[in-house]
Amino acid sequence: FVGATGAGKSSILNLIGRYFDIQKGEILIDGVNIKDIDTDVLRAAIGQVQQDVFIFTGDIKSNISLDNENISIEDVKRAAEIVHADSFIEKMPGGYDAPVTERGSTLSAGQRQLLSFARTLAYDPTILVLDEATANIDTETEALITSALAKLMEGRTTIMVAHRLST
């Protein structure tokens, strides 16, 4: 979806995740009305990368895996490699065990966004939602993400939200 601020792009995403009830019409996923899908099941299928990234106190590894025991260190490293976050992670003292402060204050905006992409990819959702995911990052990081998008979207329903068609 592309549109100006206030056009309803984020509202559509909230409808897809069933955070709001649909008043008219229906939204189908693989031909199934989302009202017929258990809310927890639906939301578990959606991986979202937003404009504003939340980074947790801990380490790089836990910020990608969110300490989910089903996500191995190999999954974390594979996800980081696909989104090109591995290049900065491996340069950090401690690599994937490098400490991260609250909100990732020691990381650049681009590095935080790459971690968010890696986090979503490690989770392996069937539906990928990119909500202004490249809006506040530098052109170099945007180029890294753009080069990884084909792999990120492979085998997934992907919904992209942007203010400009170029993003």
Where are these regions (language model features)?
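ABC-type nucleotide-binding domain
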Residues: 1-167
